[in-house]
Curated annotation (Swiss-Prot):
Protein name per its UniProtKB record: Pyruvate carboxylase
Gene (name only): pyr1
Keyword Kinase in annotation: no
The ATP-grasp domain, residue ranges: 154-351
Organism: Schizosaccharomyces pombe (strain 972 / ATCC 24843) (Fission yeast)
Biological pathway: Carbohydrate biosynthesis; gluconeogenesis
Amino acid sequence: MTSKYDALLHNQSTNTNPFSKLQDRSSLLGEKFTKVLVANRSEIAIRVFRTAHELSMHTVAIYSYEDRLSMHRQKADESYPIGKVGQYSPVGAYLAIDEIVSIAKRTGANLVHPGYGFLSENAEFARKVNEAGMQFVGPSPEVIDSLGDKTKARAIAIRCGVPVVPGTPGPVEHYEEAEAFVKEYGLPVIIKAAMGGGGRGMRVVRSADTLKESFERARSEALASFGDGTVFIERFLDKPKHIEIQLMADKAGNVIHLHERDCSVQRRHQKVVEIAPAKDLDPKIRQALYDDAIKIAKEVKYCNAGTAEFLLDQKGRHYFIEINPRIQVEHTITEEITGVDIVSAQLHVAAGFTLPEIGLTQDKISTRGFAIQCRVTTEDPNNGFAPDIGKIEVYRSAGGNGVRLDGANGFAGSVITPHYDSMLVKCTCHDATYEYTRRKMIRSLIEFRVRGVKTNIPFVLRLLMHDTFIQGNCWTTFIDDTPELFQLYRSRNRAQKLLAYLGDLAVNGSSIKGQNGEPALKSEIVMPVLLDSTGNQIDVSHPSEKGWRKLLLDNGPAAFAKAVRNHKRGLIMDTTWRDAHQSLLATRVRTIDLVNIAPYTSHALASAYSLEMWGGATFDVSMRFLHECPWDRLRRLRKLVPNIPFQMLLRGANGLCYSSLPDNVIYFFCEQAKKNGIDIFRVFDALNDVNNLSLGIDAAKRAGGVVEATMCYSGDMLNPKKKYNLDYYVNLVDKMVEMGIHILGIKDMAGVMKPKAARLLISAIREKHPELPIHVHTHDSAGTAVASMAAALEAGADVVDVATDSMSGLTSQPSFGAVLASVDGTDKQLEFDNNQLREIDSYWAQMRLLYSPFESEIKGTDSDVYNHEIPGGQLTNLKFQATSLGLGTQWAETKKAYIEANKLLGDIIKVTPTSKVVGDLAQFMVQNKLSAEDVENRATTLDFPASVLDFFQGLMGQPYGGFPEPLRTNVLKGRRQPLTDRPGKFLPAADFDAIRKLLSEKFGVSSDCDIAAYTQFPGVFEEYRQFVDRYGDLTTVPTKFFLSRPEMNEEMHVEIDQGKTLIVKFVALGPLNPRTGQREVYFELNGENRHVTVEDKKAAIETVTRPRADPGNPGHVAAPMSGTIVEIRVKEGAKVKKGDIIAVLSAMKMEIVISAPHSGVLKSLAVVQGDSVNGGDLCAVLEHE
């Protein structure tokens, strides 16, 4: 310390208040400089306040009306509004020179620090501050005049012999001058604002067609940002580096440098990531840059902090760009590597200290390690970096050794407006080497949690991990030249998304379709305890090693089928994981409850032929209503139960759908199903159409699966008057055997196969095909399924279907325990431990209570099924649908209409999707009070359900015996052309590459399984992904909390990953905001307070929102981001060409054009000048000419 500085320290006054002791001392800058006003906002204002407080100075903040809640106002000792409410625009307030000078004078400020941006390079402001008797913290007004104007700075550099980029000799006032320069020097060129920085007022022009528009936009943006629309033009260098030298000078003429920064990583001329010092810069070039920077500073008698900026071309030649006569955003990295507090030096120099007096001489300035600064902003990289606005719901920052944060409005509850720069915080990391620093920055950015607004963190992480950045070889257009940078890492945001779902549940209740009330189960679920034959408890943390699947994997499908046929005892397939809950609980059982019982099932059911657990309705219901990924369910269960074969239901050429799909979709789907864990494909066709069956059989076979070709059983085979007799079924089996199937399935979906019929049919097939394994499936709607399955086993069937007792009976499968008892002591005795089955069943008894909101109203068996033949799964759904349509009191009429509809359609096989056709027609008849005769007589004029039209057209295949005429012709008349062959033949092959591209653009990287799901259910898949984007993956949320409104102060434990559990407590529900129709919902998350804003769907909303543009409507023109409409270019009714500018939007001090997406006529404008809009709001409607 010098003697002058020591004297100040020794003259400090004493104050007994420890909290004000630091500031109650005299300022370290002397008695003349005790108070500083910062003529700026946000982060840089707080940065100056902090150093000023360390120097025992008092601080003054100023703020606009829009900034009245900004953090910088609270960090100062005093804060004052700029003008009256409405007097200035949000930006204009910080450009109000006279008002700011008046506040500074009135509050007794001695120093005025301009920060960066706004008035920091305005000579008039500096002059007025000095004239008012205060000291401007920065260069003199004359120096600002000479260097702040880039055209004057160029002239100075040329005078000093410092190389500059070829450009206009002075400011360009008129477009004609710009045009003349381009003609002389060629393209590309860059148009730059003469004043200011930060990339604003800059436009690169590569085409003569865009020169005029770019010129006008640069001038307009410069005027809006800096109060001066002057611009100049330079040649644009290709792929240069941007190197800047930090300068510090005093009034005595001392000038030093604080080494360099590499600011090459930019987007639209705005710096994104800065590095100090520059990596691998040639020492000779580095020294030349230092020398030239100091040369210019001395030439103009520079004082205070400043930055000399240079471009370095690919041949190592450097060109002077400008000197920024102010502190820079990125000054932090220089402070980190040099240990110099630049703001402190600024204040000292402004107070009259020389650099040597504060210990700053060139020989004492050295660098230590590397520093990197990243700007965390609320910009959305997926939307052209449009700034996002809204309330920050969660804010958690990084920390640790070598991590520095400079921020302001980054806190939970902060409202990000469209009025100012989008930066939340500057994260600066410092370490011994460039690579250590880079890794530290990555770690720090990953630690950040910002929810409620989008941020650029995913983009910056992608940038930091790019090879070019790792090598330190970036150039100024690197971001624009590297499209792979926009393949972003998606933040999962799991906790906040979970709270959003629970908040919606608290306000609006469950949104799961078909739910009636809340679960009856209120207690904790009790898990089974399995004991082995010796009474010891089985360790279920490891799956059983017993089971049929090992034989299948080791020897293949043919050997597996042979082993099944040679097995002397009976085998079962358990349907609890699919058809049972489809029949009883509307297919609503969730993955988590299957996962919980899976380890126990692996042991207790190790002897099972298979578990039916996938395909059919479970696939689309899991996405559509449970918001789960069916592929994830398959993979998770496969991992837990590797020993028992998994079986799925495949609707032949329909895949999982109700109508035919392109052939390549079926093959692709089966391939993915086999890869992810399916072993046995139970392939059927709803009409027993062998053409449709053959495709599914071939697809399953090519995928490497066990082909269980299945014929659908319907009617009463014992009645000679019925259409489907014994000969029909045996002939059908013959055709399937010829296709090379492994196993025969018989699917009695309505449960109408009587025990005698089972004996007769199985015996006939067994006699003709003694080596063919037979598997029989039924439903217990009539109450005779146990007897039928026992009869089937007795007659020679190898496998029958059962469901655990608590999930059996009625429209489900027969009881496991009852079938087990029925064949006990016979040759077909089943090999299971009764005690273990009871333990498994006790779990499912609890599940029945947990899913009680989805129970059907069917309370007993219905022998009338032998008449109406409604399939078990449909019987439940049809009654629910009838009630939904207001036909609940006409259930008997609906069943009667089902019989009539079936006859009208030609007495068809009834299984999804043909059963839906019969059901739709039946409800149509009841709703419209139509008899069968009415349907026949009025067929040409009735508006039939779409499924009925699909059936008669032939989209579901060809029914046995053909279509009923003339009904078919009359139904289709003037509507559709009938098909006479397999529908899939007429469908074009799916373009998987195009689908992958589409899904990747919409939802990020997409897998083969995503494509397979999309090709089956495109709309359902998109809705599912949109739900997950909004609420996250909810599969691990316990079902009790998934279906029920959260209880106040009840703890919810949700394991979102291995070893990572969220503890959530619902603590309060806020009042309704009548203006927005929303409520605040408050939670504790792992002990921290969190809240979410939820729309109350029952509330009336007072406000009227702007219409939103429909992304699927090519005529809708949307606002690309939030901001204010500053200019309307065309009138309604005008003709426009593609790319013509319709309006200009101003946001975050940037101007963005809204252009026509195609040529046409402007039908209407939805905005006027001055309107505030959000991104995606409708601005205009175009019509094609």
